[in-house]
Amino acid sequence: MNQEKEWVMRVTWKVPEELITKWQGIVRYWMRTRKLDWKYRMHYQITWAWYTMSRYEIPLGQHGSIHVDLYWHLTPEKGWLSTYAEGIQYLSNRDPWYRTELDPATADSLIHTHYFTCFTERAIRKALLGQRFTFCQFPEGHKKTGQVPSLQYLALLAHQNGLRQRSQRSKTGGTRNMGFEQGAVGRMAKRHARRYQSGSQDAFWARAPVPSMELLSGGGRKESHSHARKGL
């Protein structure tokens, strides 16, 4: 008696290898700097999951976790050995236990809620008064399907982007060439120009790409950046 084949269906996004490599580098950066409790498993550590190159497990508190599976060699019968894809699923830890497929926008929203800061309720008031407020570190988390951004969020995001652009212009044009005869003075001026100045209208902060699922799935080729400091 021949055994009947059983198939497991997954929703996947076909992506190039270099995009996976870029996303993995971004994840390693945040796991190292933020001490994120994300788990990385190689293919030999995953059982009953053929064609799985690696897996990232992202805990979401006591409720559940997100599993990001990276696949390779999906169509060996056609000789497409360099075919890569990724699948995202949510696993519940509560009774009744279940798992379900996630789209990148929903996954980004869940990750944003648990791991990255966002605008607070008092951000609008602080922005109007010229006070510092916490920036949104994960803009991709607000692109959930069917979700219409509020006017307050759009205003704060525009203000945040304006501060970032003004900061970039200040960095490029703030230090002038003082000539070869004043090289020591010029170097000293450059060192002081790079520092964070109290009372300045410009906010300087380090930026780093965030581990967005939309970026990994190829939906957003442009990297989304995080702002590690607070703005005005």
From Swiss-Prot:
Protein name in UniProt: Virion infectivity factor
The UniProt keyword set, sorted, is: Host cell membrane, Host cytoplasm, Host membrane, Host-virus interaction, Membrane, Phosphoprotein, Ubl conjugation, Ubl conjugation pathway, Virion
Q: How does it sit in the membrane?
A: Peripheral membrane protein
Q: Where is this region: Multimerization?
A: 157-169
Q: Which GO terms describe its biological process?
A: viral life cycle
> Does the UniProt entry include the keyword Transmembrane helix?
no
> How does the annotation summarize its subunit structure?
Homomultimer; in vitro and presumably in vivo. Interacts with viral Pr55Gag precursor and host APOBEC3G. The interaction between Vif and APOBEC3G is species-specific, which may play a role in restricting the replication of SIV to their host. Forms an E3 ligase complex by interacting with host CUL5 and elongin BC complex (ELOB and ELOC).
- Family according to the record: Belongs to the primate lentivirus group Vif protein family.
Query: What is the organism field in this record?
Result: Simian immunodeficiency virus agm.vervet (isolate AGM3) (SIV-agm.ver)
**Which residues are reported to carry the modification Phosphothreonine?**
T100
Instruction: Give the induction text.
Output: Expressed late during infection in a Rev-dependent manner.
